[in-house]
A protein has these predicted regions:
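Cysteine/selenocysteine-centered motifs that mediate thiol-based redox chemistry or coordinate metal-sulfur cofactors
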Residues: 29, 85-120
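CN hydrolase (nitrilase-like) catalytic-core segments centered on the catalytic cysteine
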Residues: 1-76
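A short, polar/charged loop-to-alpha-helix boundary motif
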Residues: 72-90
Length: 120
């Protein structure tokens, strides 16, 4: 996904981890204000960075394990327990009672296709 320093980014990372029952490591950059980079943007406060970071490590149930790291470059670390993946999937029913093989079918087309297709 696109880099985003706002709180919504943190919420999105937590949701992705929870929905996928997986660990998420989100590394976000830090950049000074546009003015300090020689770029003038109308109404941009000189003390506001272009990107303020927000790197975070999230567990499979959406819990923040490290971060978010904002306003500075740094290294986030977290001790993870891969058994958390198993525990997180106890209530993760991807093919359970609401899967309807009697009315839905998943077909995967394995033929190679171009990434972009131009039509007239």
């Amino acid at each position: 996904p696109t880099v985003d320093e706002r709180e919504m980014w943190q919420v999105s990372m937590r949701h992705i981890a929870h929905e996928g029952r997986c660990f998420v490591v989100s590394a976000c950059q830090v950049q000074d204000s546009p003015q300090s980079l020689g770029v003038e943007i109308a109404n941009w406060p000189a003390d506001r960075p272009l990107i303020a970071g927000g790197s975070v490590i999230v567990g499979p149930m959406g819990d923040v394990l490290a971060g978010p790291l904002r306003g500075e470059a740094g290294l986030l670390t977290a001790e993870i327990d891969t058994d958390d993946l198993i525990r997180a999937r106890y209530d993760y029913d991807v093919v359970g009672h609401y899967a309807r093989p009697d009315i839905f079918e998943l077909t995967v087309d394995e033929r190679a296709k171009p990434g972009v297709k131009f039509t007239a």
